[in-house]
């Protein structure tokens, strides 16, 4: 269920961003083109890094499901595992995507790009917070979104005085942001699913998967926020010689 809920949210996120690309290029309204262009700039490193990281994780999990048979050539999983591993390295590696998000996109235009995501998400919460069906999903999403906003503010403040703070937090920040974005995608899908659940079991299955995501995956944003709040001090404290893997232990107690 973890893999399925991530795949569904990831596909929705990719399609949602692709639609924004189309609007940024083709919409007749200049204001819409500008706003969706900002959204595309913000979401590009998230889509590239989040989906390829999860692609590797999911493929490895599915290999694990096969047990020892997953490791041998006849079942094909080992080929999938080797093929998917290159994805996080393409496009400049996912660490670079994280630095692009945290170091460039986050502060760009005084936070204007961030507002293209935060404002619609906040509007959705306001419009659906009293919806009986949606409430169990809107409440945890609202908390996760507030957590992301708090992390963003923390990084903006700390990064001004110490550039290492941005580098230390970048990968965790991208994952936190990506999970919140996936949560938003699930909310958009749920609006459709609840309206059609009586007509087709497919939509009921989507609701179950969404519930799994909100209960078991979205809470991972909390640990990412805690990691970010630990700062860069410890990460930058080990001198170069500390990375020497040659044992210096003498055996004398």
Segments from the language model and where they lie:
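C-terminal amphipathic alpha-helical interaction region
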Residues: 108, 124-253
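Short glycine/serine- and small hydrophobic-enriched flexible loop segments
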Residues: 19, 60, 103-104, 185-191
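Alpha-helix capping/hinge segments and adjacent helical runs
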Residues: 38-118, 212-252
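Alpha-helical transition-metal enzyme core signature, strongest for iron centers
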Residues: 3-14, 21, 51-58, 91, ...
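Alpha-helix capping and helix-loop boundary segments enriched in small/acidic/polar residues
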Residues: 1-8, 30-50, 68-75, 89-93, ...
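Long, non-coiled-coil amphipathic alpha-helical linker/lever segments
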Residues: 6-16, 122-128, 134
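Amphipathic, well-ordered alpha-helical segments in soluble domains
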Residues: 13-16, 54-58, 117-120, 144-147, ...
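C-terminal helix-coil-helix/basic helical segment that borders enzyme active sites and/or dimer interfaces
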Residues: 8-47, 152-168, 189-201, 205
């Amino acid at each position: 269920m973890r893999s399925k809920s991530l795949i569904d949210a990831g596909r929705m996120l990719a399609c949602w961003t692709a639609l924004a690309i189309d609007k940024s290029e083709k919409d007749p309204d200049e204001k819409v083109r500008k706003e969706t262009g900002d959204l595309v700039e913000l979401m590009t490193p998230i889509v590239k890094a989040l989906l390829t990281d999860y692609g590797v994780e999911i493929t490895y999990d599915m290999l694990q499901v096969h047990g020892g048979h997953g490791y041998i050539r006849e079942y094909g999983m080992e080929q999938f595992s080797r093929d998917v591993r290159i994805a996080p390295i393409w496009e400049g590696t996912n660490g670079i995507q994280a630095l692009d998000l945290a170091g460039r996109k986050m502060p760009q235009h005084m936070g204007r790009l961030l507002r293209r995501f935060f404002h619609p998400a906040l509007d959705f919460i306001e419009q659906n917070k009293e919806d009986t069906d949606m409430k169990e999903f809107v409440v945890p999403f609202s908390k996760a979104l507030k957590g992301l906003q708090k992390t963003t503010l923390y990084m903006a403040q700390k990064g001004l005085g110490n550039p290492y703070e941005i580098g230390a937090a970048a990968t965790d920040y991208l994952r936190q942001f990506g999970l919140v974005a996936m949560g938003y995608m699930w909310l958009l899908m749920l609006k459709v699913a609840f309206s059609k659940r009586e007509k087709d079991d497919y939509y009921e299955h989507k609701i179950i998967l969404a519930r799994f995501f909100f209960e078991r995956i979205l809470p991972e944003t909390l640990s990412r926020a805690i990691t970010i709040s630990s700062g860069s001090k410890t990460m930058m404290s080990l001198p170069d010689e500390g990375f020497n893997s040659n044992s210096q232990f003498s055996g004398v107690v």
